[in-house]
Amino acid sequence: MAKKIQAIVKLQVSAGMANPSPPVGPALGQQGVNIMEFCKAFNAKTEPLEKGLPIPVVITVYADRSFTFETKTVPAAVLLLKAAGVKSGSPKPNTNKIGKVTKTQVREIAETKQADMTGTSIDANIQSILGTARSMGLEVEE
């Protein structure tokens, strides 16, 4: 018999830096989960990744207060900013361009994100990443 699911908690936690402070502590504490157990497991799983990158995580909490979690890939916006070498997006993306990314970089990001994206093909995912880049004020070079 499958365990009864009590809650599904979605968070963004920095890779290798999970600790009981907000947002992790309050979100899991409300569900009665052992917070330190999650932090240790999450930090161990994200150890190979670059420290500090925001990692979306989906935590399934069961009625017996046990849990499982699944990490997703880094958000596309973060990968685009990193590729362009800038800190944040443009407040006016239509008029102020803040940086440039190449089609090759966009393709690499789309391939990295392939598992988490809803597009059926790599080309559809590339178009999605291009839209994200445009909305952030990034120019895409050939």
Curated annotation (Swiss-Prot):
Share an example GO biological-process annotation for this protein: translation
The UniProt entry, under InterPro entries, shows: Ribosomal_uL11, Ribosomal_uL11_bac-typ, Ribosomal_uL11_C, Ribosomal_uL11_C_sf, Ribosomal_uL11_N, Ribosomal_uL11_N_sf
Stretches of the chain forming a coiled coil according to its record: none
Single GO molecular-function term? structural constituent of ribosome
Q: Name one GO cellular component term.
A: cytosolic large ribosomal subunit
Q: Is rRNA-binding a UniProt keyword of this protein?
A: yes
Keyword rRNA-binding among UniProt keywords: yes
Regarding how it is modified after translation, the entry says: One or more lysine residues are methylated.
What keywords appear on the UniProt entry? Answer: Methylation, Ribonucleoprotein, Ribosomal protein, RNA-binding, rRNA-binding
At the top level, the lineage of the source is: Bacteria
Its subunit composition reads: Part of the ribosomal stalk of the 50S ribosomal subunit. Interacts with L10 and the large rRNA to form the base of the stalk. L10 forms an elongated spine to which L12 dimers bind in a sequential fashion forming a multimeric L10(L12)X complex.
Q: Which family does it belong to?
A: Belongs to the universal ribosomal protein uL11 family.
Matching PANTHER family, A to Z?
Answer: 60S RIBOSOMAL PROTEIN L12, LARGE RIBOSOMAL SUBUNIT PROTEIN UL11M
Biological function:
Forms part of the ribosomal stalk which helps the ribosome interact with GTP-bound translation factors.
Q: What is this protein called?
A: Large ribosomal subunit protein uL11
Q: Which species is this record about? A: Hamiltonella defensa subsp. Acyrthosiphon pisum (strain 5AT)
